[in-house]
């Protein structure tokens, strides 16, 4: 599977060929997680509508929920203005974080809202 050249030409990748992907819950607007993608992971996501990412530590692709059952159905994918990050607008089934919480950003508040 290959990424459409028109999309690939707009992406800015790091030295490892990766770019960041932010998953946002469609119904709440919550930022769920940040992961890495490469062209293949993005192509798979666009083709299947399943959040597919690249693990730097395992050096392999993974589909969110493939083992946990906590799946992401991808409704939209947007490219940011710099071309180095994609936003996935998803329906999250179950926890998004590997710790079992709904979002990876709910436990360590460094500055709370007034």
UniProtKB/Swiss-Prot annotation:
GO-annotated cellular components: cytoplasm
Cofactor: Mg(2+); Zn(2+)
Any single biological process term in GO: L-histidine biosynthetic process
Chief place where the protein resides: cytoplasm
Any Pfam family matching the protein: PRA-CH
Cross-referenced InterPro entries: PRA-CH, PRib_AMP_CycHydrolase_dom, PRib_AMP_CycHydrolase_sf
Pathway as given in its UniProt record: Amino-acid biosynthesis; L-histidine biosynthesis; L-histidine from 5-phospho-alpha-D-ribose 1-diphosphate: step 3/9
Listed GO MF terms: magnesium ion binding; phosphoribosyl-AMP cyclohydrolase activity; zinc ion binding
EC number: 3.5.4.19
Binding site for Zn(2+): 81, 97, 104
Localization of this protein: Cytoplasm
Substrates-to-products reaction catalysed: 1-(5-phospho-beta-D-ribosyl)-5'-AMP + H2O = 1-(5-phospho-beta-D-ribosyl)-5-[(5-phospho-beta-D-ribosylamino)methylideneamino]imidazole-4-carboxamide
Transmembrane regions: none
Cofactor note: Binds 1 Mg(2+) ion per subunit.
Keywords: Amino-acid biosynthesis, Cytoplasm, Histidine biosynthesis, Hydrolase, Magnesium, Metal-binding, Zinc
Residues annotated as binding Mg(2+): 80, 82, 84
Subunit structure: Homodimer.
Function of the protein: Catalyzes the hydrolysis of the adenine ring of phosphoribosyl-AMP.
HAMAP family xrefs: HisI (MF_01021)
Family: Belongs to the PRA-CH family.
Designated name of the protein: Phosphoribosyl-AMP cyclohydrolase
Native source species: Rhodococcus opacus (strain B4)
Recorded name of the encoding gene: hisI
């Amino acid at each position: 599977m290959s990424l459409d050249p028109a999309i690939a030409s707009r992406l800015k990748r790091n030295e490892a060929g990766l770019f960041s992907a932010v998953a946002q819950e469609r119904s709440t607007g919550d930022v769920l997680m940040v992961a890495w993608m490469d062209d293949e992971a993005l192509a798979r996501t666009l083709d299947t509508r399943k959040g597919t990412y690249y693990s730097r530590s395992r050096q392999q692709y993974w589909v969110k929920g493939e083992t946990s059952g906590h799946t992401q159905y991808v409704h939209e994918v947007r490219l940011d203005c710099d071309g180095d990050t994609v936003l996935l607008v998803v329906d999250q089934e179950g926890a998004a974080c590997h710790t079992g919480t709904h979002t990876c950003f709910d436990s360590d508040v460094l500055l709370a809202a007034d």
